[in-house]
A protein has these predicted regions:
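Conserved C-terminal guanine-recognition region of P-loop GTPase G domains, centered on the G4
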Residues: 1-59, 88-92, 115-134, 138-147, ...
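Canonical P-loop GTPase G-domain recognition
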Residues: 28-31, 36-92, 99-101, 108, ...
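Short flexible coil/turn linkers enriched for glycine and charged/polar residues
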Residues: 94-96, 202
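C-terminal effector/interaction modules appended to NTPase cores
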Residues: 113-117, 122-306
Length: 306
């Protein structure tokens, strides 16, 4: 949650106060509103009590009043952080006029007739940066590079073909992946990168949790359910335990796991992902993401851009 709105409607508000303290603990900006003021004979007294409890101003409104509704909107806008919405997917990697090449395998996981959400969002972000955007499938990478008058400033690839693209890219072109971009955009890249090193200490007795935000029906060669577990077991051993959760499912107790690998989280906002990361940090469990983990397993983590 980026901003919380707590509605108080009378003298009974202990449940709301519990939520208030929860949001305060999470450093979430909170607007406290005493609503239905037109039905309360002692709204000023209740507001004073709430102010004493919360140590912040209480907005007293009635939804029947247009002026009160406008006051509510103004207070809500006031709580929006100054830098809200300024972060972008490609960040400082590109400038206006840069040539960017997207490598997007159209395998069984790619939905027929459309692109997946991270690709769509990244293309829009690049267009907003006024970049020149080209795209190709993995098998057409060499043909595409040969057709260009100059090397791309940046190549963004699907993480599962990281090594293939790295081996074929021009030396001067920066390389990243959609998942790595979202690691920075939606999460804590520094922690993801640091945690990827935990892969080297895993054994066949270790437990890994893979967390994906999508709730789609898994397909053959699914990156989270098949490809990453297979890559890990190939390196560590067939005995490695890999648990998988999806959607909003995420264990409160993470202490049984030696590593968590989170997807790019294109479906969730940053605050939601950071809540997971904070939980992992509190329980001292390393947490990485799909792209960062694959880059580590491919031996190119120190050679990619983000």
């Amino acid at each position: 949650t980026d901003i919380a709105v707590l509605l108080f409607s009378g003298e009974e508000y202990q449940a709301e106060l519990e939520w208030f303290h929860y949001f305060k603990e999470k450093h979430t900006p909170t607007l406290c509103v005493l609503s239905k003021a037109d039905t309360l004979t002692d709204s000023d007294s209740i507001a004073a009590q709430l102010k004493e409890e919360t140590k912040q101003e209480i907005l007293v409104i009635s939804s029947k009043s247009k002026e009160d509704i406008e006051k509510f909107k103004e207070e809500l806008i006031r709580l929006v952080p100054d830098d809200y919405g300024e972060e972008t997917i490609t960040g400082a990697l590109v400038e206006e006029g840069d040539l960017v090449l997207l490598v997007m395998p159209q395998d069984i996981q790619a939905p027929k007739g459309r692109l997946i959400l991270p690709q769509v969002q990244t293309i829009r972000d690049l267009l907003d940066h006024k970049c020149l955007v080209m795209s190709c499938t993995t098998d057409k990478l060499e043909d595409t590079l040969a057709a260009l008058a100059r090397p791309p400033k940046l190549i963004i690839t699907d993480s599962q073909v990281f090594r293939t693209v790295y081996d074929k890219k021009p030396q001067e072109s920066l390389l990243t992946s959609f998942s790595v971009l979202f690691a920075e955009y939606k999460g804590d890249f520094a922690y993801y990168k640091e945690s990827a090193a935990a892969i080297s200490s895993l054994t066949e007795e270790s437990k890994v949790l893979i967390a994906e935000c999508c709730t789609h029906a898994p397909l053959k060669e699914d990156i989270g359910r098949e490809k990453i577990p297979n890559m890990l077991r190939k390196r560590i051993g067939a005995g490695l335990t890999v648990d998988i959760v999806s959607g909003t499912d995420f264990p409160k107790d993470l202490s049984n796991y030696d590593l968590i690998i989170q997807c790019g989280a294109c479906m969730f906002n940053k605050k939601y992902v950071m809540t997971r990361i904070e939980r992992a940090k509190e329980q001292k469990v390393p947490m990485s993401n799909y792209g960062v983990a694959i880059a580590y397993l491919s031996g190119i983590l120190d050679k990619i851009s983000y």
